[in-house]
Amino acid sequence: MARPVSDRTPAPLLLGGPAGTPPGGGALLGLRSLLQGTSKPKEPASCLLKEKERKAALPAATTPGPGLETAGPADAPAGAVVGGGSPRGRPGPVPAPGLLAPLLWERTLPFGDVEYVDLDAFLLEHGLPPSPPPPGGPSPEPSPARTPAPSPGPGSCGSASPRSSPGHAPARAALGTASGHRAGLTSRDTPSPVDPDTVEVLMTFEPDPADLALSSIPGHETFDPRRHRFSEEELKPQPIMKKARKIQVPEEQKDEKYWSRRYKNNEAAKRSRDARRLKENQISVRAAFLEKENALLRQEVVAVRQELSHYRAVLSRYQAQHGAL
């Protein structure tokens, strides 16, 4: 149904612009005049936000919708509606933009709250080997691998310092744990020296009780071939003593003095002979124990060498794949 001529809004009022303006800018000037005429006094606190929303709504208002068409000042019909006015030409309420929340790029992100994580400690917690140093160079001191904090955007204001961030204290604890791990690894790499006399080889050695009786001094502790140690003087070769030439003494000269001296010499020779035989028995029993222990240790050395060659092959493959340690 056609409207009366008096109810129609003249096109030059909305679409027409002042003299000298381009024909495409009439709709923009008419919409701006309508917005400025219907705007209410704004509060100072929300002035900046409303100004941004109005600037964002201007390009959307000039774009034709799916059911509207914009026409120039020459061919605009009498009942055309431009911008946000009423069909009769009266200024209506301006449609608010669809998104009232602040824009994503205008938000202030907490870039200062960045937690620092030690890379070696993280790998050790998850059962992974630490990162090897670069090959060919000296091993640098372990330094915590910190995540670089991104530079704050132009909209962020007064971001907190990394030192005052709440995640910095757990990071220090993680660094302390990692340093303690490295100290423990270093102490295990260089073990303390071991006294060879305190090492006992697990073996079964049961000497003959008769040999132990011949190797022990009567009235003293039983000889133990496992723990007995001979001195250097005892282990030296003993010289062969030549037997003294026998002197024939006539019967008439064999008095009490002669028999007393001969008795003492026989006792000394017997004591020397018993001591020599005792030492020989001890050395023989000790040598039997050492021979058996030596055979067992040789087998252990062969097993250790095989294990060492296996570990060296594993280490060489690791260095070929990941570089030198």
UniProtKB/Swiss-Prot annotation:
Annotated family: Belongs to the bZIP family. PAR subfamily.
Biological processes annotated in GO: liver development; positive regulation of transcription by RNA polymerase II; regulation of transcription by RNA polymerase II; rhythmic process
PANTHER family, A to Z: D SITE-BINDING PROTEIN, THYROTROPH EMBRYONIC FACTOR RELATED
Organism: Homo sapiens
Job of this protein: This transcriptional activator recognizes and binds to the sequence 5'-RTTAYGTAAY-3' found in the promoter of genes such as albumin, CYP2A4 and CYP2A5. It is not essential for circadian rhythm generation, but modulates important clock output genes. May be a direct target for regulation by the circadian pacemaker component clock. May affect circadian period and sleep regulation.
Transcription in keyword set: yes
Chief location of this protein within or outside the cell: nucleus
Biased composition (Pro residues): 129-153
Protein's UniProt name: D site-binding protein
Compartments in which it is found: Nucleus
Origin organism lineage: Eukaryota, Metazoa, Chordata, Craniata, Vertebrata
